[in-house]
Regions:
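Short coil turns linking two alpha-helices in DNA-binding domains
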Residues: 29-32
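Arg/Lys-rich, alpha-helical DNA-contact motif
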Residues: 1-25, 39, 43-49, 57-85
Length: 85
């Protein structure tokens, strides 16, 4: 479950986050991060050797918002509408 404040530092704008970073910082799971990416709610900006996804830090904010909205009872379809997708 995401919290309002992170206990860990988020990388600066130029630094990319791994799927593991996204899961840890949003207090979710790797599976959750992959699910939200597959649904189009967050977008990986690159894939490293070995297929590892990398995300811009702004995608962390989108993930956290989506998690809060799901917790509030909104469907994925409703969240997509709110995100303009």
């Amino acid at each position: 479950m995401p919290t309002e404040e992170h206990n860990e530092e988020v990388p600066e704008t130029g630094e990319l986050l791994t799927t593991g970073d996204m899961a840890r910082l949003s207090e979710s799971t790797l599976r959750t991060v992959r699910f939200y990416q597959e649904e189009g709610l967050i977008e990986a900006v690159a894939r490293a050797d070995g297929g590892h996804r990398h995300f811009h830090p702004r995608e962390l904010r989108k993930l956290e918002l989506a998690l809060h909205l799901r917790e509030a009872g909104l469907s994925i379809a409703n969240i997509k509408q709110l995100f303009g997708l």
